[in-house]
A protein has these predicted regions:
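Sequence signature of WD/YWTD-type beta-propeller architectures
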Residues: 22-306
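Bacterial Sec-dependent N-terminal signal peptides
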Residues: 1-23
Length: 306
């Protein structure tokens, strides 16, 4: 199904119907071409899927109720991906650069590494196997994998403040990169390994920022009135996609909001609309979802009914 204006106008109307009461969620899993802005709906399903990643081999993975699923873009077949005991995952997950490993943010109350029902970061072989815990402190939410495959970037709450941290894929001591008041979240590496893009509330408004991989020289990138979240550099290093909440959500990124995907040209810093506004938010594009050739982005929109 190809669409543009009519579809988004329709699902935007659903936002007026959304409430905290439990309602049936329909997920629309899309890809959007960054050059033509053509949107293809890969799958429509009456279940709540979140946070697509695009594997180097060309399929998607998504989260549903804590478990991870693959979606074949050609056959539309959905299969559960075996992740061992890690079956209470949130929507912060993603592939290693070589596609052999999957990072998970798993809530395991029974694992000795966790002190409470909050996520630690694990990695698991993409073909299945037992997860290996990476972070010992909780909560820790994975967001990025360094291009050399050696380091993970994540958001973590320590002593009441959420900041950006990095850690070796072998575990060990974590390194704190941000030290300002307010939420710092969504870190993702540029493919040349020079920068980390992230979103921060340090200015009193949620914006996209960039810093060195050691946390040096933080620089604000967006300055508009939207609440901007989850920047993801493209594999060819030319673009950064992010999700914009079209109202001031302060330090929240909730489900059931009017949002829009935006695209930053890394050379000129020009920002353009990649989609029209639609009904989404949490789960739409939390994690890296670029196609391997940097021509498309995968995302999820929603419809909520009785």
């Amino acid at each position: 199904m190809n669409f543009k204006t009519s579809f988004f106008a329709l699902i935007l109307l659903c936002s007026a119907l959304f409430s905290s009461a439990q309602r049936k969620v329909t997920s629309f899993i899309h890809t959007v071409d960054i050059y033509t802005e053509q949107i293809d709906t890969v799958l429509k399903v009456d279940e709540h899927y979140e946070a697509p990643n695009w594997h180097p081999d060309g399929y998607l993975i998504l989260n549903k109720k804590g478990r991870i699923y693959t979606l074949d873009l050609k056959t539309k077949e959905v299969k559960e991906l075996p992740t061992g005991f890690a079956i209470e995952n949130n929507n912060d997950h993603g592939f290693s650069p070589d596609g052999r490993w999957l990072a998970l943010s798993h809530n395991d109350r029974n694992h000795p590494s966790t002190k409470s029902y909050k996520p630690s970061i694990y990695i698991v072989p993409i073909r299945g196997g037992e997860p290996r815990v990476i972070t010992k402190e909780v909560p820790s939410y994975w967001h990025g994998w360094s291009p050399d495959g050696q380091t993970l970037a994540y958001c973590a709450e320590r002593n009441g403040n959420f900041d950006v941290y990095t850690i070796s894929v072998n575990g060990g001591e974590e390194k704190r990169l941000t030290f300002t008041e307010g939420l710092d979240d969504g870190p993702d590496y540029t493919p040349d390994g020079k920068y980390i893009y992230f979103n921060s509330y340090r200015s009193g408004h949620m914006h996209i920022w960039r810093m060195g991989v050691d946390g040096s020289n933080p620089e604000q990138i967006t300055f508009d009135e939207n609440s901007n979240w989850f920047p993801h550099p493209s594999p060819d290093n030319n673009w950064v996609v992010y999700i914009a909440y079209l109202s001031d959500e302060k330090e929240d990124h909730l489900f059931g909001k009017t949002v829009q995907l935006k695209l930053i040209n890394r050379k000129t810093r020009e920002i353009k609309d990649l989609t029209q506004p639609f009904f989404g938010g949490q789960g739409t594009i939390n994690v890296p979802s670029w196609s391997p050739d940097s021509s498309k982005v995968a995302f999820v929109s929603y419809r909520v009914g009785e």
